[in-house]
Amino acid sequence: MAEIKAADVAKLRNMTGAGMMDCKQALTEANGDFELAVDVLRKKGQKVANKRADRSATEGAVISGTTKDNKNGSLIVLNCETDFVAKNEDFVKFAHSILNIALAKNPANLEELLSLDLNGTKISDEITNQIGVIGEKLDLSYFEKVSAEYVVSYIHPGNKLAAIAGFNQANIAPQVAKDVVMQIAAMNPISIDKGDVPQSVIDKEIEIGKDLAIQEGKAEDMAEKIALGRLNKFYKESTLLNQQFVKDNKLTIGEYLNNSAKGDRKSVV
């Protein structure tokens, strides 16, 4: 059996980020072979992942960014189990490394993002590696992207909230774009305008509105009218262009964009 030196343990720790005792044990099992020791650590990570599969990963980092030309934007959610890990500098750095790959490679979906290379390893495998290092279940649970003439991103302090927005003209004022993306982060609209709301959602809102009106003793025909009135309220609360602007509730976001465009309307895409 090979002698495991402290310098070897430190070297493996620097290579992998794993704990000192984990590295020593891995090198012992691998008889001093660094490549095999890395595999041992990876296998440990896989075991941790399986062991913790029934535990939720509800904390984490929600982050977004854009390419340097502001033509593309991406948003990801990397979950962990505890707030302690979510605030860990290495965890946040790892999340940003995944985001940077998403921006550079522009994958079609989450599955494709997970298959991309990060430091010579597929992102999905690197997540497994990090599970072994960190000791918590990690999950890349969400990925979204936007491509447009001008894309802006926003990350709320603490990495718990983020948003991206695309505009169909490149000459939009940066402050206007920032205001809109912060509106999205704050008010969480389900669509850009009324016409973008799925019919299934509209039908559900009308049905709920009618049921509420009937429970209040309204006749069927009156309940229908009341439901449509409530639907208009739903549009104002849930569609971006019809929401009240959080910085000036006398304006909707649509009106704010029109006023800012000086006759040349800028639309969110």
Language-model region placement:
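N-terminal assembly/interaction segments in proteins that build large macromolecular machines
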Residues: 2-269
